[in-house]
Every structure is written in structure tokens, then in C-alpha cells.
Amino acid sequence: MNDKYFSRVELEELLEDFCLKASSEGFSGIVSIVGGAAMLLAYESSRAQTTDIDALYPHNKALEKVIFNISEERGIQKNWINGAVEEFVPYGVENAWVHYKDIYGITVRVASAELLLAMKLAAGRPRKDFPD
């Protein structure tokens, strides 16, 4: 399956679905979003779409099942939300997160503009990240 590109509206729908199903599994924590999805959701950006939601969230069987089920229901890539970026998120950065919204008892926050810039610079991908 080719990766699907998601617009801002589609990202909001995916987050709504994820939070509804995750809360029904007893999850009530925090989901922290970085990368292109954070830029689409919270900032004025020339970016119109992204292929995934790079996020920090607890990895457990219940949430992984929710993610898998949503991918099956919607016919999208299985890694539509993933934590692959976790090792690249610097910890201890002051004001690193901005509250986005609360959805079904789950706090969704996005990386601050400063954190996004720091991560883009650290990634060292000028061709890919320059438009951002």
C-alpha cells in the first residue's frame, strides 16, 4: 500500500477517531505531536499535507490495536501515527509543547515552533525540510 497523504482536516478526523477509541480502552494521557502534522495542525505553513503523524504516546497493546484498527477501517498505512521520532525529540527544552486541544479526555499537544525548528535543523535534511 502506498502512503496516503493527509490534509489538516483529515488529521483532525484521525485524531478524533484515535482519541475516541483510545479513551474507550481506558487511555487518558497525553499525545505529543511533532513534525509535519504539528505544522499542519497548529501553525501557518506552506505545507498542505503529510504522510503520517509523528507523535509521542505510550506504546502498549491496546493503543497499537486502536492504531491498527483505524488503519484497517480507513484503508490507510499501518504507521499513520507512529513514535519513530521519539529518539530525536530533545528532552528538557523549555516551553517545548503547546496545548492543541483535549479530545475525549486525552490531551493533544504540538511541538512549539522553537522545538520544531531545532528538530528540523538537527535532522540535517535541507532538501526535504527547506519548504517547512
Could you describe each region identified by the protein language model?
Residues M1-D132:
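Compositionally biased terminal segments of proteins
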